[in-house]
């Protein structure tokens, strides 16, 4: 597999642990569970009729004087629903990124695409996207309006775009942003080779886009692969991650997809997290927790939410489920480790094994790898 390196790894060695960084990192069972050597910046760019949220590395200290960025799920609602909600029903989610902070000049950094799920929005997994930026990746997440929250609630886009075509448009848009004189991310993005991860329906996007020639790895989260699908799994390195109480995408579907990927020549990996539900790889359960969660807040405010969306919007948030914050370190570590290995930042896999459990006490999980 071709290998790709960037100067940020040298920064990691200097900032984190000195000259012994590579040895210490390689020996750590869960080296990437915590934030990396960079801060995370965030900016929003336009792509036709929709927005792309972009997270990127920021040198330590360059976030001075800035407040952590927050987003509001209410901003993604159709106008008709927004008009029903009282003005004070608008819980923020505070992220680990700083808006418009100056981008580190230690790049260019590899591009990772994130695809959100059904009835969701581009910011849905900032717990992960900001983390990846701290480890030296530029992460771009577009609004897949065709399956987004506003569309599901009655305000679809016109025209509608096919998901993989839209994903390619994001790559092209990021390449232009990299070349635009004076742009915040000028010279900071490498788009020659990319990776993609996605949640639920976005995991399906990652599978379909994974066959593109410039993709080095695809990482479906809480997603499966129908046995009767007309799409063939790409013979590319893959990481499949889900929870064993997922009531939306039955875990067996993810396991079957991993087993199908295991018949190919490229490495396939599976992480199955005990007691994690469908929304574990997202911010959603953590939004408005004090009010019973975002769905309960909406119901209390009188929003007419279909029962199917109530189930989708609460799976993994129930009291018996693993608290989502306890699952995040495991998700962060394995996704980061897979990306660093696939892009060649780590010449050998770091923490892609059962041994990672030694550094991830918050959650219990099983790990498989093939071949």
Model-predicted segments: where are they?
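C-terminal motif of bacterial Sec signal peptides marking the signal peptidase cleavage site
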Residues: 17-20
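Active-site machinery of serine-nucleophile hydrolases
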Residues: 57-59, 70-81, 123-151, 157, ...
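A conserved short beta-strand
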Residues: 142, 214-225, 269
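Gly/Ala-rich beta-loop-alpha elbow adjacent to hydrolase catalytic centers
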Residues: 198-202, 206
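Active-site-adjacent alpha-helix of alpha/beta-hydrolase-fold enzymes
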Residues: 233-326
């Amino acid at each position: 597999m071709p290998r790709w390196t960037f100067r940020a790894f040298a920064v990691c060695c200097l900032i984190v642990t000195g000259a012994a960084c590579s040895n210490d990192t390689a020996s750590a069972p869960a080296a990437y569970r915590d934030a990396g050597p960079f801060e995370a910046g965030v900016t929003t760019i336009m792509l036709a009729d929709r927005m792309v949220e972009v997270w990127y590395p920021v040198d330590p200290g360059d976030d001075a004087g800035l407040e952590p960025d927050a987003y509001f799920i209410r901003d993604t609602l159709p106008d008709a629903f927004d008009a029903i909600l009282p003005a004070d029903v608008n819980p923020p989610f505070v992220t680990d990124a700083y808006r418009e902070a100056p981008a580190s000049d230690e790049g260019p950094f590899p591009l990772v695409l994130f695809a959100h799920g059904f009835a969701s929005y581009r910011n849905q997994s900032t717990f992960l996207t900001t983390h990846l930026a701290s480890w030296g990746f530029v992460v771009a997440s577009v609004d897949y309006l065709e399956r987004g929250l506003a569309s599901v609630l009655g305000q679809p886009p016109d025209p509608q775009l096919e998901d993989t075509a839209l994903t390619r448009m994001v790559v092209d848009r990021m390449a232009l942003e990299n070349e635009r004189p004076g742009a915040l991310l000028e010279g900071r993005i490498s788009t020659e080779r990319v990776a993609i991860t996605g949640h639920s329906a976005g995991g399906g996007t990652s599978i379909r886009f994974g066959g593109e020639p410039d993709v080095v790895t695809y990482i479906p989260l809480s997603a499966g692969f129908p046995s009767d699908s007309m799409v063939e799994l790409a013979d590319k390195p893959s990481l499949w991650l889900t929870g064993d109480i997922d009531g939306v995408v039955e875990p067996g579907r993810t396991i079957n997809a991993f087993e199908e990927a295991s018949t190919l020549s490229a490495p396939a990996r599976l992480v199955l997290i005990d007691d994690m539900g469908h929304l574990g790889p997202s911010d959603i359960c953590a939004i408005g927790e004090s009010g019973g969660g975002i769905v309960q807040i909406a119901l209390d405010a009188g929003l007419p939410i279909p029962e199917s969306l109530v189930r989708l919007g609460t799976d993994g948030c129930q009291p018996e489920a693993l608290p989502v914050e306890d699952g995040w370190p495991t998700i962060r570590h394995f996704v980061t480790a897979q990306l660093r290995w696939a892009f060649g930042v780590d010449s050998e896999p770091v923490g892609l094994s059962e041994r990672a459990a030694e550094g991830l006490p918050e959650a219990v999980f099983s790990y498989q790898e093939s071949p």
